[in-house]
Amino acid sequence: MLHSNIIGEGKPLLILHGFLGSGDNWKTFAKKWAEKGRSVHLLDARNHGKSFHSDEFSYEIMSQDVIDYANNQGIDKFDLLGHSMGGKTAQFVAQQFPERVDRLIVVDIASKAYPPHHTEILEALSELDEQQFESRKEAEEFLMPLFPETDLRQFLLKNLERTHEGVLSVKCNLSLFRSHPERIGKALPKEPRIHTPALFIRFESKTFQAVNDTGALGGVAGVGYAVQFDDIPIS
């Protein structure tokens, strides 16, 4: 079963994080939405965060993980928000289990195929893992020349956890991701079509545009590498 952090009470909202992320990436926004009467479930995908590792890793399998989680929690229908990899998983859930999803929000991803583009990050995390640093400061100093963007470094550092030996280790399943990078970018099937009410949000530089199921567009400034916004219409 997927690890989760549940915040608030009310109508369920399930949030699926992006590649190399975890549910906690959305904790700040989950608290705000919980204040509006939502029960926000921050899920860690398999091979990420505190969830289990498995060589089985596909959007079909990850979408079934979401349904299995909802069944275990006694949740029949839910709103679903997915970012990046989580956005593809969310789309697959809406395709295959339309009766379970009330509303769908997809952030910064389409259903098309993407070429592998995380090689540099995965290699850096692998090298960092081998260093067995004892402090996050050491780990950040190691990453700084490779990734000068502070937001990206902080995002990657969230992958670290302290072992029983007192050193920092990468939580995600690096060996799998490095062996099969193509699985992340795989296209979703074109059928069945999604008929769930949906909002698709795309990023353009430091702004993003929102495209909903009626074709309306909107923009919000100030969005960087890590998702940093709270104007998604969830209520």
Regions found by a protein language model. Name each.
Residues 14-18, 202:
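The conserved beta1-alpha1 loop
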Residues 131-188:
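Conserved alpha/beta-hydrolase catalytic His-Asp/Glu region
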